[in-house]
């Protein structure tokens, strides 16, 4: 068993490396002095600064009587021959990360947990504390309690003003599922006001706007920037004539980065879709089925028009991660490969996992029970409403671009998907998506009417249905 040797006490027996932030810190689960613990090891150029900031945050939480895992010890160690600082915390028995709970619990259980998190954040604010890294993963839940972890993000204010507190609350709310929050937000604002001993919640209309701003900003930072550079989720390789972004989860697959080799594979693979603009093929790598979507350059004029613009492959890459970020089903992205001469782009490839699943029309043709059909209709309509609330438009909602996997819809063909920032254009694009989707069922009156009824029930805001002319004023 691996050990972390400490300068002033017995070593930590490491059972699991929980998290690694290169050149900054390592978080491990293990045993220290016969007790189950979590330890943070700070190393690198700013090790002491990060260590002291985390320690300060933990002390602020403890002083305010806010539940946080007890700090059992502080010590020093060595990483790569350099001094490292160690904080050792008691492991909380049966505690689960609240991000995991929100992803796996029933709707009522999710609301109950969200309300508890809002109360905890209200207690932070009441004590003049602000968690700047406000993610559900920075809280642990047991049957009875919520624990705040990660002291590094805790800041103390002599007097925390209302505006700052509401921005921080909005940051937390932006991390909840957009469809859940659409139904919960009024109740959660009431929970917060009661926890702060406020008679009413001030600026009630401001918070939803802030939530949307934070949500879009966080998603864009991840999908439009982070996954195009070296990070935990993605490995980057840059060659003289090629740019490669590789999903860390698929780093073991023997996929070539040379475009000539990829073209040879596409030529031998099973063709799923041919055409001048793009070619889609199914290939096998190390036993895994992989979809290769190659965006072709048709001629010199087409090359000149594309070389300064973002490739459609990179749009698919970003949107796949965007949907994953929002918890929307889509095949996992594997790699993005672009021909590049300096900053000039050429042919590009988007690789994703192959998912064996019927499209939505085939799925409905297989369904016999009306209850199953109605539940499937509701799932698809909820997907559409979620996209509307997120200001995301797909651009081509034909039935073949919606697969059904384990009775849940999955979106494919993401190169026309757009993240809108203006409500006017978001509404216009969503109405277009709705019209295209409903045209799929123009010859099936029963299914068309089932979707229409579900849209009327699920959509709290009927304006996109009216705009799409599938519902009258």
Where are these regions (language model features)?
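Conserved protein kinase catalytic/activation segment
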Residues: 138-149, 401-412
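Catalytic-loop of the protein kinase fold
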Residues: 129-136, 392-399
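AlphaC helix of the protein kinase catalytic domain
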Residues: 97-106, 360-369
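C-lobe/activation-segment region of protein kinase-like
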Residues: 147-217, 410-473
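Short, glycine/acidic-enriched loop or turn micro-motifs at the edges of active sites
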Residues: 136, 153, 356, 399, ...
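Conserved ATP-binding subdomain of kinase catalytic cores across diverse folds
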Residues: 3-96, 116-127, 131, 252-359, ...
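Juxta-kinase regulatory segment immediately upstream of eukaryotic protein kinase catalytic domains
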Residues: 1-16, 206-268
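Conserved alphaE helix
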Residues: 109-120, 372-383
């Amino acid at each position: 068993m691996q050990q972390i040797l400490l300068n002033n006490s017995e070593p930590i027996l490491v059972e699991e490396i929980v998290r690694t932030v290169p050149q900054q810190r390592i978080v491990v689960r293990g045993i220290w002095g016969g007790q189950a613990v979590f330890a943070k090891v700070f190393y690198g150029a700013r090790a002491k600064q990060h260590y002291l900031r985390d320690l300060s945050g933990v002390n602020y939480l403890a002083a305010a009587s806010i539940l946080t895992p007890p700090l059992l010890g502080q010590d020093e160690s060595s990483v790569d021959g350099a001094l490292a600082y160690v904080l050792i915390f008691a492991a909380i028995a049966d505690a689960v990360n609240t991000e995991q709970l929100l992803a796996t619990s029933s709707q009522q259980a999710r609301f109950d947990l969200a309300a508890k998190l809002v109360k905890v954040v209200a207690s932070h604010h009441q004590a003049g504390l602000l968690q700047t890294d406000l993610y559900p993963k920075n809280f642990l839940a047991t049957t009875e309690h919520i624990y705040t972890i990660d002291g590094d993000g805790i800041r103390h204010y002599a007097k925390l003003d209302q505006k700052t507190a509401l921005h921080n609350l909005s940051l937390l709310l932006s991390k909840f599922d957009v469809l859940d929050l659409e139904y919960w937000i009024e109740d959660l604002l009431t929970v917060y006001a009661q926890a702060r001993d406020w008679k009413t919640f001030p600026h009630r209309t401001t918070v939803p706007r802030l939530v949307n701003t934070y949500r879009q900003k966080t998603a864009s930072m991840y999908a439009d920037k982070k996954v195009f550079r070296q990070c935990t989720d993605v490995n980057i390789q840059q060659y003289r004539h090629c740019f490669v972004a590789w999903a860390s989860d698929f780093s073991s697959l023997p996929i070539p980065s040379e475009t000539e080799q990829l073209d040879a594979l596409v030529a031998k693979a099973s063709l799923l879709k041919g055409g001048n603009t793009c070619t889609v093929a199914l290939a096998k790598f190390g036993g895994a089925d992989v979809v290769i979507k190659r965006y072709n350059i048709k001629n010199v004029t087409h090359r000149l028009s594309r070389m300064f613009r973002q490739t459609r492959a990179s749009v698919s890459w970003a949107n796949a991660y965007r949907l994953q970020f929002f918890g929307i089903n889509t095949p996992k992205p594997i790699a993005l490969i672009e021909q590049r001469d300096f900053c000039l782009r050429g042919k590009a490839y988007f690789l994703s996992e192959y998912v064996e699943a019927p499209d939505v029309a085939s799925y409905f043709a297989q369904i016999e029970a009306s209850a199953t059909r109605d539940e499937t209709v509701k799932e698809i309509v909820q997907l559409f409403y979620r996209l509307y609330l997120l200001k995301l438009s797909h651009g081509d909602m034909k039935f073949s671009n919606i697969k059904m996997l384990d009775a849940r819809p999955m979106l494919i063909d993401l190169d026309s998907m757009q993240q809108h920032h203006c409500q006017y254009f978001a509404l216009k694009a969503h109405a277009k998506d709705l019209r295209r989707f409903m045209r799929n069922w123009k010859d099936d009156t029963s299914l068309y009417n089932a979707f229409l009824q579900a849209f009327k029930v699920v959509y709290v805001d009927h304006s996109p249905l009216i705009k799409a002319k599938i519902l009258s004023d």
